[in-house]
């Protein structure tokens, strides 16, 4: 019997070698995590077939390592799986021989190299004045008053997928809770970026959706870096949590992070949006076309570029046809860990403005996540100067009438 099992295993390997490799993302060598991969299955695969494939991949991994030197050598094999509507896959650490066989397996759609994900913030300045709230609640620049409806995001839950959030910060008035951590064992914001973005989309003083609930989803470490696979885990947790708790259709997510174009990252972002969560994402800070970055180029998400207080597109903001709207992104003051405040700049700061307005409109107008970005674009004002190629001039506006 063992002979036939061995023969079957060898037959699978031979079949795999007859199929072209489906490794992608190799052209983006920047920030690649060595020997780490994300495997995406074909959309037609059943749950039973997915389980069988995982067992096969793990067996091939163990066999190849055993033939090499008998040690793992940091190559742990299959680590985590993810499942969205029409999208299944897993991530892991494999040697080149194993991942080549996996990529040729008939059940596999493609394999993408795992890469380092970074924040989209660029500068820090302590305790500077903010201007973003006044700007997004008036059709013209110049006012420091924030005009908004008292519903203020009530009944909406916002997932901050970031460096974590200081959930005890007074800005959140008991509305913030810890969700999950896919990057380390420190369930706190050791960087500050996640607390800052959350303060913008839902803080009591510096925020837009002041009555929304906030959930911290930590996918980036103290240095502001993580992995594509770790971010996918975090997004998976959000969609599962929203489903279990009846929050689909009443939830938003902020993604102030990104990498060079990733097919799997875009597909996961699209799946999360389609599951009933409004996604606001940062365009990036490379001063180039945002279509080259993920999740900025994902379909259906609301991609935010950045302006300064004079309504000019910043020199560092990415741009292009994937940008849905501009938002305040230069010198934005917001919450910071340990009851502090700080001022940051970047499309990381524009995105939570869009996320906050999205949550605000969901509560105020009762619109679904799939309609929010269109509504944001409908309300936005044509006021952005220093226009970039093939890019909207629309600036975020909450429709207050001011």
From Swiss-Prot:
Span of domain Inhibitor I9: 36-119
Pro-peptide positions on chain: 21-120
Top-level taxon of origin: Eukaryota
UniProt GO BP: proteolysis
Signal peptide limits: 1-20
The keyword Hydrolase is assigned to this record: yes
Pfam families, per the entry: Inhibitor_I9, Peptidase_S8
Example GO molecular function: serine-type endopeptidase activity
InterPro entries tied to this protein: PCSK9_ProteinaseK-like, Peptidase_S8/S53_dom, Peptidase_S8/S53_dom_sf, Peptidase_S8_Ser-AS, Peptidase_S8_subtilisin-like, Peptidase_S8_subtilisin-rel, S8pro/Inhibitor_I9, S8pro/Inhibitor_I9_sf
Catalytic residues of the enzyme: 162 (charge relay system), 193 (charge relay system), 348 (charge relay system)
Keyword line: Glycoprotein, Hydrolase, Protease, Secreted, Serine protease, Signal, Virulence, Zymogen
Residues carrying covalently attached carbohydrate according to the record: 254, 390, 398
UniProt similarity note: Belongs to the peptidase S8 family.
Entry function: Secreted subtilisin-like serine protease with keratinolytic activity that contributes to pathogenicity.
PANTHER family listed in its UniProt record: ALKALINE PROTEASE 1-RELATED (PTHR43806:SF58), PEPTIDASE S8 (PTHR43806)
Protein name: Subtilisin-like protease 9
Organism: Arthroderma benhamiae (strain ATCC MYA-4681 / CBS 112371) (Trichophyton mentagrophytes)
Organism taxonomic ancestry: Eukaryota, Fungi, Dikarya, Ascomycota, Pezizomycotina
Gene that encodes the chain: SUB9
